[in-house]
Amino acid sequence: MEGHSDMEIIRAVKGSATGEINVHLVARDSAGSHPHLPTTTFIIPTNAATLGLPSTALDVSYPREPVHVGAAERVAGSEPVTATILPQLSTGPGTNSTVRLLDWTGVSAPLAGSGMRFRINEYATQNMIEIERPRSPEQRHEGGTAGREADIQHPDVHKDPQEVIPQEPSVDAGSCKCQTCGPQQSIGLDVGSSGDRCPQPFQKRSVIVENSGCTVASELIKPMKKRKHKEYQSPSEESEPEAMKQGKGKDPDREPTPGTSENEEWSRSQLVSSEKKEGWSWESYLEEQKAVTAPVSLFQDSQAVTHNKNGFKLGMKLEGVDPQHPSMYFVLTVAEVCGYRLRLHFDGYSECHDFWVNANSPDIHPAGWFEKTGHKLQPPKGYKEEEFSWSQYLRSTKAQAAPKHLFVSQSHSPPPVGFQVGMKLEAVDRMNPSLVCVASVTDVVASRFLVHFDDWDDTYDYWCDASSPYIHPVGWCQKQGKPLTPPQDYPDPDSFCWEKYLEETGTSAVPTWAFKVRPPHSFLVNMKLEAVDRRNPALIRVASVEDVEDHRIKLHFDGWSHNYDFWIDADHPDIHPAGWCSKTGHPLEPPLRPRESSSASPGGCPPLSHRSPPHTKTSKYSFHHRKCPTPGCDGSGHVTGKFTAHHCLSGCPLAERNQSRLKAELSDSETTARKKNQSNLSPRKKPRHQGRIGRPPKYRKMPDEDFQALPPSVVHQSLFMSTLPTHADRPLSVCWEQHCKLLPGVAGISASAVSKWTIEEVFGFVQTLTGSEDQARLFKEEMIDGEAFLLLTQADIVKIMSVKLGPALKIYNAILMFKNNDDVFK
């Protein structure tokens, strides 16, 4: 049977001249039924002056904590319980052959083999400032024998610096400082009592003196290292620091082991990915590639500007040119600011029309600019052109107009001499460079003018200056022996004559002397620079000059396939010298490494550095495989341009199999150009839409009268709303394969099929989906067909169409699933 003994009182009494110190250990049975056991007294010779004990007795009471004594070590409580302190002897000079019991570190020192610690007070005497509480039986059992053996150390081993107790400020000789409560005044230092009564727990565990029935010199108890307090942790919490310790010093690019946590692998992969991007630099890359960058002198001032700060803020409103219709000015809102670039949103229209410009772009103007210059401004959807007012619009939308000083001043730019509105010239079709067509000057702003091709829609228009290599004086084609494309539907295209045409239209030609000759650029092949990815304009990548012409360069994105190469003007605002991104604060996409490109295959999982956040073990769905498998693609952008993100190969603008689709959208195909070149008198492409030239409305068949009854604050709801999340790294809010089963009539239907639905078909689908005829009737009243239905956002359904949130979520999720099915089927 196991017995217990309590460490009750140790009385240290200052001895006589011999300096004896009697240490009494009194053991008592826990039940109190046995008399006191025999005690063992150790007489340790030392000088009282060495210890500096006060004249009064020093009583030290230990907390009454039971000490386990094995039954095999004592029989019926007859054997004494012995605790021994082994002093460190010092025979150096000046020690007077005394025993140095305290190991001084600064002004405090612990007593070896005990939990007591002493310090020197302002009177140069030693006071005990701390005593540690013995461990409970449960704590001792937790440590076990292995823990005791690991904690025992020799007196000459230095302690861990973390375990050195800092000096307590201003504690006088008569005070005891509790670890938790603070100083306690007492005449006789009774630390054990104050510690017992302290309502707050001790922060450290004590070292217990183990008892032995038979002890020899080699088995004397040695000073023990204090064990740090360990908070209770759940198994998952305990495994995390262990995994972190195991991960130190290992290769960050190693493959995950079976015992490695998936969450840890994802966190590590994100860190590695960010380190790769942050660790990339132009200097090291140029040294590695043995290449040179394009000198800054080769760029225009607008391309190389880095000293100006981008002062535009989110939500600011301004006026700007529509890139798809360069002759039209729209109300725009700053939807995103990145470095020295802006993403602009057309107020009242879908985000699929958003576009990027530099902050110094000449195509943007402050609010009210159109009134001062006499231009025509297209108001947001729902506003009448003649009733639109900037002041009223800003109040209704609670928005701020972009300050005028943020725009590039164009007042110092003189107008082009000789170019006036209505004058005729010959111009190259930028979408079909092999064609030179009859054109007119339709607008002049500062030093630029707008070139418009006669009798064609404005989608072919472009802005240029007098030195543009794409414009020529009247009669240039005849002198060069090149065919001239007459205006569309010209009565007698075979016999087109400039003199007759100018007389019929009552116009004049731009003087020949007004045209300026632009010298060719000086870019060389293999020069490095930074360029906007035209397939995903939000990104700027490291590029190289692959080929050159007089006024154009062919760019290649380093590390990517040559299928992505494209031609661009040498003065285009989307190319910048090396280092432009870092100076303006814009992220730069580093070159795609061969390892990255080979580690991911079409249809497979992306490499570790491109992983999505892992799902937990309790999660029902995993979005790891919903990531775009194209190497180096972050999931942003879409091949159709209608969405801001994608997660399938069919929607990736960087996928090689989609390049034909992209080229068809970026410019007309070479086949079409050849056909037009062979028959230069054949009509060009018909206008993309009949009637009023401009951006197609959000609801194609919704009459304008329906919007007049809506307040402006309700109409302007499409800002910052997207059909898909902008960041594809974030998991989608639904799992298509599972949730499509919960929505009737959604599975197996693609967006291409929905776009052909009639108004009645949309009405029937909404009625079946929501089970409410009233909700479906709203779509019928608004004359929403399939194509308009796919353009709806959640905010449109809830706020504009006043559909309740529950049915609106079903409808919007159905739209997202249609689009996802379209990607899957393709």
Swiss-Prot record:
Q: Which residues participate in Zn(2+) binding? A: C628, C633, H646, C652
Q: Where is this region: Interaction with monomethylated and dimethylated peptides?
A: 453-460
For this protein, what is any one GO molecular function term? methylated histone binding
**GO cellular component labels:** chromatin; chromatin lock complex; condensed chromosome; nucleoplasm; nucleus
List compositional bias (Basic and acidic residues) regions by residue number.
242-256
| Chain positions of site Mediates recognition of monomethylated and dimethylated peptides | D429
Q: Which residues form the SAM domain?
A: 757-821
- Sites of the modification Phosphoserine? S136
PTM summary: Ubiquitinated in a VCP/p97-dependent way following DNA damage, leading to its removal from DNA damage sites, promoting accessibility of H4K20me2 mark for DNA repair protein TP53BP1, which is then recruited to DNA damage sites.
User: Which segments carry the region annotation Disordered?
Assistant: 134-155, 220-272, 586-623, 663-705
Q: How does it assemble?
A: Homodimer. Interacts with RB1/RB (when monomethylated at 'Lys-860'). Interacts with p53/TP53 (when monomethylated at 'Lys-382'). Interacts with CBX3, ETV6, KMT5A and VCP/p97.
Return the domain comment text from this UniProt entry.
The MBT repeat 2 specifically recognizes and binds monomethylated and dimethylated proteins. In contrast, it does not bind trimethylated proteins. The MBT repeat 1 does not bind methylated peptides but inserts a proline ring in a Pro-Ser-Ser/Thr sequence context.
Q: What is this protein called?
A: Lethal(3)malignant brain tumor-like protein 1
Tell me the organism. Rattus norvegicus
